[in-house]
Amino acid sequence: MTGRHVSRVRSLYRRILQLHRALPPDLKALGDQYVKDEFRRHKTVGPGEAQRFLKEWETYAAVLWQQAKDSRQSSSGKACFGTSLPEEKLNDFRDEQIGQLQELMQEATKPNRQFSITESTKPHL
């Protein structure tokens, strides 16, 4: 890998983690971990796959930037993150990628129990 390529990858990686700061805490944690895993997993791929990988993550960063900007400007105060994948894009995925996408969707749509507070009449000893 050339120094220029490594610099581009690192810059994109940092930019994505920075954009994740706009996400709700549970999605930020999920997104950060997913990005770290994916970038680590693609460290040793060939040049063609590396270019596709970077292109997709650059698109993700651009979409997330726009959604974060729209969220800040929204008068309703509701943040809306994410997008639907067109069927033709899904058809390009390998089985392993479909499995990862399914796991990610399940994690992202889980009820957030991290911050839920339940009242208890008595302490449990």
UniProtKB/Swiss-Prot annotation:
The keyword Transit peptide appears for this protein: yes
Location(s) in or outside the cell: Mitochondrion matrix
Entries under Pfam families matching the protein: Complex1_LYR_2 (PF13233)
InterPro entries: SDHAF3/Sdh7
Superkingdom, taxonomy of origin: Eukaryota
Organelle targeting sequence: 1-30
Biological process according to GO: mitochondrial respiratory chain complex II assembly; succinate metabolic process
GO cellular component, one term: mitochondrial intermembrane space
Coiled-coil zones: none
CDD domains the UniProt entry points to: Complex1_LYR_SDHAF3_LYRM10 (cd20270)
Keywords for this protein: Chaperone, Mitochondrion, Transit peptide
Protein family: Belongs to the complex I LYR family. SDHAF3 subfamily.
Role played: Plays an essential role in the assembly of succinate dehydrogenase (SDH), an enzyme complex (also referred to as respiratory complex II) that is a component of both the tricarboxylic acid (TCA) cycle and the mitochondrial electron transport chain, and which couples the oxidation of succinate to fumarate with the reduction of ubiquinone (coenzyme Q) to ubiquinol. Promotes maturation of the iron-sulfur protein subunit Sdhb of the SDH catalytic dimer, protecting it from the deleterious effects of oxidants. May act together with SDHAF1.
Subunit text: Interacts with Sdhb within an Sdha-Sdhb subcomplex.
PANTHER family, A to Z: DC11 ACN9 HOMOLOG, SUCCINATE DEHYDROGENASE ASSEMBLY FACTOR 3, MITOCHONDRIAL
Protein name: Succinate dehydrogenase assembly factor 3, mitochondrial
Organism: Rattus norvegicus
The organism's taxonomic lineage, starting at the top: Eukaryota, Metazoa, Chordata, Craniata, Vertebrata
